[in-house]
Every structure is written in C-alpha cells, then in structure tokens.
Amino acid sequence: MWQKKRPDLCSTLILSGFFLALPVQAITDYGGFRDGDVRFFGEVVNAACAVAVDSQDQTVLMGQVRSNSFTDLGEWTDPHPFRIKLEDCSTNVSQNVGVMFSGETDGKDLLVFRTGNGAGAAEGIGIGITDATGQLIIPNTAPARYAPIQEGETVLHYTARYRSTSRTVKAGNASAQVWFNLFYQ
C-alpha cells in the first residue's frame, strides 16, 4: 500500500515544482523584472462637459515681482492669463457653467488666496483670480457668474494677479495651490 501512494506523491511534488517555475520563466523571457510604473488617472463624470487633460493640472507662472513695487494695501500686479478648457460639451445636459476656486485664503484679505508656506514664504501678498470680464472671483464661494456652454468645446478665461495684503510686502516664495470645481445650470 505504501509503495502505491509513493509515486503519486512524487508526481505531485514534481508537477508542483514545474508549475511554480513557470511564472519565473515567463518573467525572465520578457526581459526581467518590472522596470517601471505606468499609472492611469481618470474619472467618469455625469456632467455637461469633461475637463480637458491639459486643464486638469496647470501651472501659472507668476514670475518675479519686486517687494518694493507695492506701496500700499490692496495694490495689484499685472495679470497672468490662464484658461480652463472643457471638451465634449452637450447643451442638452446643461446650458451654463460656473467655476468655484477653492483653497486657503490670506488671513488679512479673504478675497485672495494665501501665498507661500513655512520658512522663506513671502508675507503681505496673496493671489486673486478674475474672470473674463475682470470681476474678482471670491475664493471658496459658489459661482456668482455662469458662462454659456458651447456645443463641443468651451474655453473659460481667467487671470491671476498678486495683491498686497499689507502695506509692507516681505520677499519670499509666493506660490499657492488652488482647486476648481464646475457647477452647471
């Protein structure tokens, strides 16, 4: 009886070893182990438009501004334009779109976003955003104005500007991070 089961046990062990070795062999046949990573980010939305890929993560270059160019509270620098491009828009779903910009506001001026963070941050300055008509967009507030949606593609134009929030502006990092959300009517 012992003799009869022994070949079955040996066969099982040999076959197990063969199957365990297959994935290793398959990996080495295709050039070795993993050499890199590809990550895919996306979202399925139920909205009138989709945000174009090049508008999802933007960098607006604000440039350098001399701290002594501000002589009083509430002064603005030159505007820096940016846009939000919407694709695959359908006016059958909604007729208008508005944008809410969110982020940390400046403690001295709630109409602009806080700039800099930590050691080396600029002080006495924030970033304000205006729409295509030049109206200041109040941070963290539902849209006050809506733009008509164009069938297919809609482009929303904005400008960003530094604004002094103190009579004295201290030089340093004046970057900010702001998010946007679309609202439809």
Predicted regions and their residues:
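Mature extracellular/passenger domains of Gram-negative fimbrial/pilin and adhesin proteins
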Residues: 2-11, 17, 22-185
